[in-house]
Amino acid sequence: MFARTQFDRAWAIAGMIRRMSIYDAAISKLDGTPADLHDYEGKALLIVNVASKCGLTPQYTGLEALQKQYGDRGFSVLGVPCNQFMGQEPGTAEEIQTFCSTSYGVTFPLFEKVDVNGDAQHPLYKELNAVADADGYAGDVRWNFEKFVVAPGGAVTRFGPKVTPEDAALVSTIEAALPA
């Protein structure tokens, strides 16, 4: 045991052991095909757990507006459906895609439905939930439409679900995260 601890310490000191990054999380697109989050590594991202039957669902309009405004500048919204909050995303992948495209004209990428909290929490959200928001809250996602701005290189800024896509602080954070 002692030798193993010394070995681990030596590797950590040498910088060879690193914490998982959000880009390492395995996730699939909404259609079930594997996605590689490393494809987004040089971009500014807005990762949002989304739901179709929530009082905050109209935020899709603002999320799509951000995608249109900044998409050609190295930015993308990533929508991650979740059904953990009062069952407000009960649909199949096909139903979610149809709802988002026909009701809100969503063009940003949508990923598989995942758990953002609890025992079956997706590894992406294990990383994101460790980040505190401006009020110091870190931990479980509180509701649908919690937002995480990820700058190129992986720095994360967290915003609560009631922060709208048009919020000045959110927009300012996105603009600051855009690649040069």
Predicted regions span which residues?
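N-terminal amphipathic/basic-hydrophobic helices that include classical n-h-c signal peptides
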Residues: M1-R19
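N-terminal "domain-start" segment that seeds a small globular fold
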Residues: I13-H38, P58, H122-P123
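Amphipathic alpha-helical repeat scaffolds
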Residues: K29, N49-K53
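Conserved helix-turn-beta segment immediately C-terminal to the redox Cys motif
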Residues: K43-A44, K53, T57-V80, S101-Y104
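Thiol-based oxidoreductase modules, predominantly thioredoxin-like and allied folds used
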Residues: G74-G91, T107-G118
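Short, internal strand/loop/helix patches
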Residues: E94-N144
